[in-house]
Amino acid sequence: MFASRPVVHPLEVAAPAHPVQQPAPGVLMKDLPGMPGTPGGLGLRVLQLLFAAISLAVMSSTADFASVSAFCYLITTTVLQCVWSLTVAIVDIYALLVKRCLQNRRAVTLFSIGDGITWLVSFSGACAAAGIPVLIDADLIMCSENPCASFQTAVAMGFMCCFSLLPSFLLNFYSIASSHG
């Protein structure tokens, strides 16, 4: 059987002076917008803090929220969300000011776990509180006696807080999953 054999011809090319400065092969996407330590990540944290603070302010401005446990739970979850978002926003601001990368495995894992827990708790609080205005308005027809619009606004801001937290969680989780590679 006649098989062809490849012939290798060496090329005379000068070696790079500093091979350490060569970029690694492949495309590196470590600074996705929305990741910790990026301007997009800081923007998401500010949105989360803003929505949680509005929900907290609107719900606590009503006099009747303390009589319903779901509303108290929403207040608790928004306080937790405010504390978490403010803390991570401060870390993001620091990282941006000193040009520090927050893409190490431990930090991203911590942010991912924190985002996952706060998302789950915030979403459950918003879902629990969402049923009460529906009950008051549709079933009991008592919105004239209760501030239903305030309740609905607080619940809507709670959901907006959850939806602005979801990209942070998913990006951090993706970063952890893709680094196992």
From Swiss-Prot:
Q: Would I find Manganese among this entry's keywords?
A: no
**Entry keyword set:** Cell membrane, Membrane, Transmembrane, Transmembrane helix
Residues assigned to the Cytoplasmic compartment are 1-38, 99-115, 175-181
Q: How does it sit in the membrane?
A: Multi-pass membrane protein
Q: Does the keyword Cell membrane apply?
A: yes
Q: Which residues lie on this side of the membrane: Extracellular?
A: 60-77, 137-153
Q: Which GO terms describe its cellular component?
A: membrane; plasma membrane
The primary location reported for this protein is membrane
List where in the cell it is found. Cell membrane
Membrane-spanning intervals of the chain: 39-59, 78-98, 116-136, 154-174
User: Assembly and partners?
Assistant: Homodimer and heterodimers.
What family is this protein classified in? Belongs to the Casparian strip membrane proteins (CASP) family.
What name does UniProt use for this protein? CASP-like protein 5A1
Its organism's taxonomic lineage begins at: Eukaryota, Viridiplantae, Streptophyta, Embryophyta, Tracheophyta
